[in-house]
C-alpha cells in the first residue's frame, strides 16, 4: 500500500491517524485508520454518497476519545479514491455492485487484518446501505 494524504479542513484538524491507497482491481481506494492500539475494538465508519474522509473528522475524534479504533475509506469515485470518469470531479461507477465488491475486498484483505476486534459498523446514507449489504454476506466479519 502507498501512503495517502489526510487534509486539514478549515474548522477541523485531522485527528492523528494514517492513510493509504489500497489497490482493488484497476482502482486505488483511499483508506484511513485511527487509534489502532485500541483494546475496545474498531468502528468501521462509512460515508454517504459524494462524501469523503475529511468530512468525518469530528465524528472520528469522538470515537477515538471514547477509546475506539476507527477505519474508513473513500468509495470509488469519491474523495481521493480513483475515478473512472474523464472529468475527475465527477464521481461515477459502472454499477452499484462495484461499491459492494470494493468494500468486500477492503474489509477482508485489509481492515480485518489491521484492525482490533470486536468490529462495529457505523454508516451514513449510502455507507449504511453498503454496510447492510456486507452484514448479510457470507464473509461478514462483524460481531
Question: Where are the model-predicted features located?
Answer:
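An N-terminal hydrophobic leader/cap segment in hydrolases
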Residues: 1-23, 29-36, 121
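Donor nucleotide-sugar binding loop of glycosyltransferases
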Residues: 27, 52
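Active-site glycine-rich loops that stabilize anionic/oxyanionic intermediates
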Residues: 40, 46-51
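Short coil/turn segments at beta-strand junctions that form active-site/ligand-binding loops
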Residues: 40-41, 67-68, 117-118
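Conserved alpha/beta-hydrolase
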Residues: 53, 60-86
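Alpha/beta-hydrolase active-site loop
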Residues: 91-111
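Alpha/beta-hydrolase fold nucleophile elbow
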Residues: 114-125
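Short glycine-enriched nucleophile-adjacent loop
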Residues: 128-139
